[in-house]
Regions:
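Catalytic cores of large soluble enzymes that bind and process phosphate-bearing ligands
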Residues: 48-55, 198, 230, 234, ...
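Small-residue-rich
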Residues: 1-87
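Generic structural hydrophobic/aromatic packing signal, biased to beta-strands
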Residues: 1, 33, 77, 102, ...
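C-terminal hydrophobic structural anchor segments
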Residues: 231-267
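Residue-level marker of positions within ordered structural domains that often coincide
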Residues: 38, 247, 290
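Long, internal scaffold/assembly segments composed of regular secondary structure
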Residues: 84-145
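Compositionally biased, low-complexity/repeat regions
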Residues: 5-9, 259-307
């Protein structure tokens, strides 16, 4: 088990944290890690939340980047937004933590924690490209949600402000019963390619497929030209193999946006690289994500025929 006295910052420390041991023990199987603490633990609030949340952000980002670069096992973190005080929250929308999200709100009033299990369950039920706030997903499986002492529906301006500051938060829609996540923001600038959990999960899945596909080619013999470059047939074969793997696993499953050719990715190997000299093959892989209707503006008026 995990020592309940440990802070989230300590748990996520890349050198000594228990999370690192968990990642290694699972041999790359983990796609996302949700970190929460016992509600009985003491909270020391600053900038609207337990200070531990903000110090854990950098640690979680470092851990996720280490897992990606060293283990070829990309993943994301969701941190529990503990100890919400109702005062001005720190703005996460200017940060750089594009592998970490912070969840606010709980199923109990004035709770020190957040409904991490609700978010984890919703994510587990969705394909990687799907936004957790998609209305067609249906309402969350909870009858009440609170932010601090108030129900979510009692202060829509506060909910909007929390969302704008880069937190994951639930909301209500007029005319619909139940609660929905407002969006899937991660703790970084909105212009980051991976500012949203859906894009993060898509690119991470493509990464894993490419890694697994290319691993079969490790230390394989390569037909080369007299200048040490790869022969055209070899390059074409490698590119097609990677594209086929991703298109079969993701594009065909509706997880990538297909182009006119029916493909959702493209792979390119520079034919000028001298593989004999470097023993390295460099490749560029691009995948096509979906767009999301975060705002829908309607110009509405009467249709009148003038006689």
């Amino acid at each position: 088990g995990v020592d309940k006295a440990k802070t989230m910052t300590e748990l996520c420390d890349r050198q000594t944290g228990a999370v690192k041991k968990l990642i290694v023990s699972q041999n790359g199987a983990l796609r996302g890690i949700f970190v929460a603490r016992d509600n009985a633990t003491k909270v020391s609030a600053t900038d609207g939340l337990d200070a531990d949340v903000f110090t854990a952000l950098a640690k979680a980002q470092q851990m996720a980047e280490w897992s990606t670069t060293d283990l070829y096992a990309p993943l994301f973190f969701i941190l529990e937004g503990r100890g919400y005080t109702g005062t001005t929250l720190k703005d996460l929308s200017n940060e750089t933590y594009n592998r970490v999200g912070v969840l606010l709100g709980d199923t109990e009033a004035d709770s020190q924690g957040a409904c991490v299990g609700t978010l984890a369950g919703r994510l587990a039920s969705l394909p990687v490209q799907r936004n957790i706030g998609r209305v067609k997903n249906g309402a969350l499986k909870t009858t009440l949600l609170y932010v601090g002492k108030k129900k979510v529906e009692e202060d829509s301006e506060v909910i909007s402000s929390i969302h704008d500051k880069g937190y994951i938060i639930a909301r209500k829609y007029v005319g619909r019963s139940g609660y929905f996540f407002a969006d899937d923001r991660l703790a970084c600038v909105e212009t980051d390619d991976y500012a949203h959990l859906s894009n993060r999960r898509v690119i991470d899945k493509a990464y894993r497929i490419a890694y697994n596909t290319l691993l079969d080619m490790m230390l394989d013999e390569l037909e080369i030209n007299s200048d040490g470059t790869m022969q055209t047939g070899v390059i074409t074969s490698w590119q097609q193999t990677v594209e086929n793997a991703i298109n079969r696993s993701m594009t065909a499953a509706g997880e990538l946006s297909a182009g006119n050719n029916g493909e959702g990715c493209s792979c390119y190997i520079d034919p000028k690289q001298n593989v004999v000299a470097t023993s390295k093959v460099e490749m560029t892989l691009k995948v096509r994500p979906f767009g999301y209707a975060r705002y829908v503006d309607v110009n509405l008026g009467f249709q009148v025929t003038t006689v």
